[in-house]
Amino acid sequence: MAFKDNTLTFSDNKIWDPIVNMEVMMDWEVPIMEKSAEFICHNKGDILELGFGMGISADYIQAQGVNSHTIIELHPQILERLNTWANGKSNVTIIEGDWSSISGLSTYDGIFLDTFGDENLDKFKDFSLSKVKTGGKITYWNNEEKEYNPYSFDLVSYDKISVNPEENMYTLIKNNYYMPKVEL
């Protein structure tokens, strides 16, 4: 069964997937989402967000006053929450589906990948490099407590962010998150 077919459980502080018996996202990630949004919104231009989750990063992206904010989401329950969240936000475009198979996308000043149960992560480097504008920035969820570059970007640096995660099943992070920063 693919992630998009799983029935999720939502609470104030997390999204839970009972099929795989783990969290999809938790609110302890707020400092990570805030710093990620600040990084990719460097010029308040056009932003592409892959995965909506709890909407934490989307709130911070909107707070930056960006020109446009395109969000691609695959999971129908999260998509429903995304549509409610986006109501009245004229600079938001929602695309339903798998980011790796969407055609006709524009180019963007910033790209943020934070998906769950994604089977196409091996395509992220080529995809993001083809969609980011010259001078653009890319970041992605780093599930390790170290500098980690699974996509083999040539120019990546890291900002260390102190976090205090609740006990969870989905990450190896204990005290520090290393936010990857790809600047082109």
Locations of regions flagged by a protein language model:
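Class I SAM-dependent methyltransferase Rossmann-like catalytic core
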Residues: M1-G45
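Conserved class I S-adenosyl-L-methionine
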Residues: N43-G53
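Conserved SAM-binding loop of SAM-dependent methyltransferases across substrates and taxa
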Residues: M54-V66
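Conserved SAM-binding motif I beta-strand of class I
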Residues: S68-E73
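C-terminal substrate-binding/active-site "lid" region of AdoMet-derived donor-dependent transferases
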Residues: I78, E119-L184
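Conserved SAM-binding loop
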Residues: L82-N83
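Conserved SAM-binding strand-loop segment of SAM-dependent methyltransferases
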Residues: K89-D98
